[in-house]
Amino acid sequence: MNSFMALVLIWMIIACAEADKPLGETGTTGFQICKNALKLPVLEVLPGGGWDNLRNVDMGRVMDLTYTNCKTTEDGQYIIPDEVYTIPQKESNLEMNSEVLESWMNYQSTTSLSINTELALFSRVNGKFSTEFQRMKTLQVKDQAVTTRVQVRNRIYTVKTTPTSELSLGFTKALMDICDQLEKNQTKMATYLAELLILNYGTHVITSVDAGAALVQEDHVRSSFLLDNQNSQNTVTASAGIAFLNIVNFKVETDYISQTSLTKDYLSNRTNSRVQSFGGVPFYPGITLETWQKGITNHLVAIDRAGLPLHFFIKPDKLPGLPGPLVKKLSKTVETAVRHYYTFNTHPGCTNVDSPNFNFQANMDDDSCDAKVTNFTFGGVYQECTELSGDVLCQNLEQKNLLTGDFSCPPGYSPVHLLSQTHEEGYSRLECKKKCTLKIFCKTVCEDVFRVAKAEFRAYWCVAAGQVPDNSGLLFGGVFTDKTINPMTNAQSCPAGYIPLNLFESLKVCVSLDYELGFKFSVPFGGFFSCIMGNPLVNSDTAKDVRAPSLKKCPGGFSQHLAVISDGCQVSYCVKAGIFTGGSLLPVRLPPYTKPPLMSQVATNTVIVTNSETARSWIKDPQTNQWKLGEPLELRRAMTVIHGDSNGMSGGEAAGITLGVTIALGIVITLAIYGTRKYKKKEYQEIEEQESLVGSLATDATVLNGEEDPSPA
C-alpha cells in the first residue's frame, strides 16, 4: 500500500511540473505546439543560418532557434522564434524599377544584394559563383549582349536576430572538435576541420532578412542596340519596362504608345529573356500584378539578406566554457579557412571583353588588358625526394629534368624552389614479436600493424638567368591532374609528341623537345608561382637573381591558371593571355584543401591556459574535460602536478617499476612457500623412518627373548 501511494505521489509531482512549463515546451517541443495553440502560421523566412557568400547559397544553421514563448510578429500574423524580432513595414512598399547592366562586373544579386556588397574579406568575388551570376556572364560574353532587368518588389517584414542568440548544438560541436585539436597542438588537423566547417556552414551568418516577394524579368539585348541608342538609354530601360508590363497584363499608359517602334526594335534585338518569381503565387503567362500581389501574404521568401563573417560569432561570450585565448585562436583558424576559400576561387585576369587579352575565367581584373607579351624560355622542372620513414615512396615522387637527365637545371638557367611538402601513405604489414612470462614461458604473437610512410619532396622549375640560345628550352603544352583536364586537349593527357613530367603529388607538366612537330601544340609560358614563392619573370631584374623576392603574379600579357592545390597551397602557372579561356565557367573549388594527417603526431595535453592581458588562468578538469576559471589554490596545485610530473618519473615508468616489484615479491613468496612445504615434508619422512626403525627393533627383541626362555609346555 505504501509503495502504491509513493508511486501516485511521484506521478502527481511530474504532472505538476509539466503543467508549470511554458506553452511552447509542453510535451513535444517546437513550433507545432505553438501552431496548434495559436492557430497561426509559422514565419519561415528567418535569420541565423550560415551563408556561402561566393555561391549565394543557404548553409547549415549557426544560431539556435527555440519556440518556448510562442512569440508572434508585432502584427500578430506569424509565429516567430524566441531569438528573433521583426520590423513590419506598416506602409505599402511596392517598388518597381528598370536598369541596364552593361557589364557582368556590375552584377547585383536580386535576393542577396546587402550581404554581397559588404566590404569584409574579398568582396570583389562575392556572388561570382552563384547560378544567377554565371548565367548572366555567359550570356553577355557569348551573345555579345547587355542585360536589362525589370523587377517589382514587395517587402513585408525585416527579420533580425537578437544579440543574445546562442549557437546551435551542431555548430558548437564542430567548434569544440577544432578546439580539441588546437589544445593538442594538432594544427594541421584543426585546419582540416575548419575547412570542413566552411563547407558545411559557409562564410557568413545571416543576421537580417527582408521577407516579401519579387517578380523579376531579365533580358539580354545585343550590345549594338544599346550603342545605337546611347543618347537615349532611358528609352531602352523604358522599352524593357513595357515588355515586362505586357507580360503581366498591365495597362500601358498612352505616353508609352508613341515608343512602339523602339519597343519593337528592343524585342527584335533581344537574345534571351527570363521571368522569375520569388515568393507569391507561381508565375504563369498572363498573370496580373494584382493577382500576384494578393498571393504574397502566404508565400513569403527572403528578397534580401545582410550578415557578418562567420568568425565574428566565435567569441568568448558565445563559448563561455572555453578560455578566452583559446577562443581567439579558434576564431583565427576559422577566419584563415574562409580566406583560403576566397583565395582559391579568385581568378585574376583581363575582364575587358574587347581586349585581345580577355580572360573569360577571370573574376577580378589585374590590369593585364593592355600589356604586351614577352617571349620567355622554359628550362624544365625537376623534383627531389628524401625518405623520412617507412616504405619506399620516392620512386614515385622523384622527377629528373628532361633537359639534363638529372636533378638540376641546364647551363644558363637557375632553379626556383616552388614548394617543399611531406607526402604520407599508410600501409599495414604482419609483425611478429616474442612475448614471455617470467622469461620462461614464451610464445610468438603476430598481428597486422598499420604504419605511415613519409617522404619529403622539393619541387623546382628552371628560369633563364640571362640570354640563352634559341630553342634551348622546352615547349610547354599545359598541365593536368587526376581531377582536372589539360585545356590544350580537354582531357587528362598531353598533346601529341609531349611528355608528362611529375611534379608535386599529382601534377603532370606536358613538355616537348620537338620544335618542328610540337610547336603547333605549344603555348607561350610565363612561369610558375606558389603560396610561398613568387614568379621571377614578373620583373626581368629578379630573373637574374632568383633569390630576390618576387611578386606572386604573372608577367604582363600573361594570365594565371590553377595548376594544383597541394595540401592547402595553391600553385599557379602563367600562359599568354587569351589562351585557355574557352568553354564554360569554372565551378567553385570547395574545401577542404588540406589533407588530414593519417596518424596524429605526438599530442600536447594542454591543462592550463593563461590570458596575458587579463592575467586570468583557465584549468581543464581531467575528469570532465571541461574548462573553468582557476582559483589561486587550484593553480598552485596544478603547477605542482605539472612540475612534479616533469621532474619525477613518468606514469609508464612508475607503472613498470610497480609491476616489476610485484612480480619479484610474488616469486619470492612462492619460493618461500615451496621451500617450507618441502622442508616440512622432509621432516615428516624422517619421523616416519625413525618410528619404523624403533618398531622393527622392538619386534626383533621380542623374538630373541622367546627363544632364550621358552614357555613350559
From Swiss-Prot:
Modifications made to the protein after synthesis: Proteolytically processed in two steps to generate the Macrophage-expressed gene 1 protein, processed form: cleaved by trypsin in proximity of the helical transmembrane domain releases the ectodomain into the lysosomal lumen to orient the pore-forming domain toward the endogenous membranes, and processed by the asparagine endopeptidase (LGMN). Proteolytic processing in antigen-containing vesicles is pH-dependent.
Domain MACPF, residue spans: 30-345
Glycosylation sites: N185, N269, N375
Induction cue: By CSF1 in fetal liver macrophages. By interferon-alpha, by interferon-beta, by interferon-gamma and by bacterial infection with E.coli and M.smegmatis in embryonic fibroblasts.
A GO molecular function held by the record: wide pore channel activity
Record note on disruption phenotype: Impaired immunity characterized by a failure to efficiently prime CD8(+) T-cells to cell-associated antigens. Defects are caused by impaired cross-presentation of cell-associated antigens. In normal conditions, mice do not show any obvious disease phenotype or a change in immune cell frequencies.
UniProtKB keywords: Adaptive immunity, Cytoplasmic vesicle, Disulfide bond, Glycoprotein, Immunity, Innate immunity, Membrane, Signal, Transmembrane, Transmembrane beta strand, Transmembrane helix, Ubl conjugation
Summary of activators and inhibitors of this protein: Forms arc- and ring-shaped pre-pores on top of the membrane at neutral to slightly acidic pH conditions and converts to pores upon acidification. Undergoes transition from the pre-pore to the pore in a processive clockwise hand-over-hand process. In the pore state, 2 alpha-helical regions refold into transmembrane hairpins (TMH1 and TMH2) in each protomer that form in the ensemble complex giant beta-barrel transmembrane pores.
Site positions (Cleavage): N352, V353, N357, F358, N359, F360, K628, L629
Broad class of the protein's primary localization: membrane
Organ and tissue specificity: Expressed constitutively in a variety of cell types including macrophages, microglia, neutrophils, T cells, marginal zone B cells, keratinocytes, splenocytes and intestinal epithelial cells.
Membrane topology field: Multi-pass membrane protein
InterPro entries in UniProt: MACPF, MPEG1
Region of interest called P2, as start-end residue ranges on this chain: 410-653
GO CC terms: cytoplasmic vesicle; endolysosome; phagocytic vesicle; phagocytic vesicle membrane; phagolysosome membrane
Entry's Gene Ontology BP terms: adaptive immune response; antibacterial innate immune response; antigen processing and presentation of exogenous peptide antigen; antigen processing and presentation of exogenous peptide antigen via MHC class I; defense response to bacterium; defense response to Gram-negative bacterium; defense response to Gram-positive bacterium; dendritic cell antigen processing and presentation
Subcellular location(s) per record: Cytoplasmic vesicle membrane
CDD domains xrefs: MPEG1_P2
Residues of the signal peptide: 1-19
Pfam families noted in UniProt: MACPF (PF01823)
Disulfide bonds: C34-C70, C350-C369, C385-C394, C432-C446, C436-C442, C531-C569, C554-C574
Protein family per UniProt: Belongs to the MPEG1 family.
Complex and partners: Homooligomer; predominantly forms a homooligomeric arc-shaped pore complex instead of complete rings of 16 subunits.
Protein's job: Pore-forming protein involved in both innate and adaptive immunity. Plays a central role in antigen cross-presentation in dendritic cells by forming a pore in antigen-containing compartments, thereby promoting delivery of antigens for cross-presentation. Also involved in innate immune response following bacterial infection; shows antibacterial activity against a wide spectrum of Gram-positive, Gram-negative and acid-fast bacteria.
Protein name from the UniProt record: Macrophage-expressed gene 1 protein
Organism: Mus musculus
